[in-house]
Amino acid sequence: MTGQLRLDDHLQRYSETAPHALAVATAVDAIAAAAIEIADLIGAGDLADASGLTTGRNSDGDVQRDLDVQADAILRRCLGKLSIAALASEEMREPQIGDRAARICVAIDPLDGSSNIDINMTVGTIFSILPAPDDLALAFHQRGSAQFAAGFVTYGPQTSLVLTLGDGVDIFTLDRKAGCFRLARSAIQISEAGEEFAINASNRRHWDPPVRAFIDECLAGVEGPANHDFNMRWVGSLVAEAYRILTRGGVFLYPSDARPGYGDGRLRLTYEAHPMAYIIEQAGGSASTGRERILDLSAQSLHQRVPLIMGSSNEVRRVEELHCDPLLVASISAPLFARRGFFRL
């Protein structure tokens, strides 16, 4: 692995390409340094008192674990040394305003999937880098298409950094001996059609009819309109699901549903859906709410939630088509629809 391109060399080349590029490269480098520290903390587990114990709830009401707090502190310390106009985090109620003359704003989910810590499953860090507007009150109300860069880190069997700087997607793997990230895969492309779908099927009774119809088509396999079989996956970690899609294709669905608190979806637009959608599109895939392109949306509040369907473009397009089907749309209020399908008799 020693002969492969180092992340810092990759960022050095990029830093000379545009007026904002140096600021973006410096922020990515700081996030990578924080990720190495977080990876060590997670890897030590209980030996380093890095437990998945809950410490309360964050500002948006989600369960907050000790590692969420520690990861947030590490990232804020590393990014706090830089010239950044505004910083937003899942663990913060409001954005932190910094250098008003800076060119960039950064949004982070310090530790996505932290509920998986207890069972030793993959967790990660997600980040989005945006231009700094003249009015910093609007810093995190921009469309997703405005992003300069986005990425995520997976802490699993390998520690990997998935990165787009607006010109394709590359994957860097942590070289633990050298203490740096090195290029492992470049110019990632998601297959147009996938053979896997990921959704929490236990919530089927709560889904809207278009989502149920799509999953029923997947389950019908070669005997249905898709004309090929699917496998089902569900990890419960957004970074793990996204990494699988980038490397194997397929589609991930976290739709809105009828449960209290899930009517607008569950994932946050600014620091989860936006960066993931940017990465997926840069790799040739698609990302949608089922009705709208994720990157066309602008957040009305920092912690706004949205549905997210992302992955191979054929499958995402089919979900959107079903959301436009007048019969399915009309049946959303029809209770008997819930009795149909492969999971109900």
From Swiss-Prot:
Q: Membrane-crossing residues?
A: none
Q: Which cofactor does it need?
A: Mg(2+)
| Catalytic activity reported | beta-D-fructose 1,6-bisphosphate + H2O = beta-D-fructose 6-phosphate + phosphate
Q: What is its main location?
A: cytoplasm
Listed SUPFAM superfamilies = Carbohydrate phosphatase
Q: Report the sequence similarity comment from the record.
A: Belongs to the FBPase class 1 family.
Protein name, entry field: Fructose-1,6-bisphosphatase class 1
Q: What would be the name of the gene that encodes this protein?
A: fbp
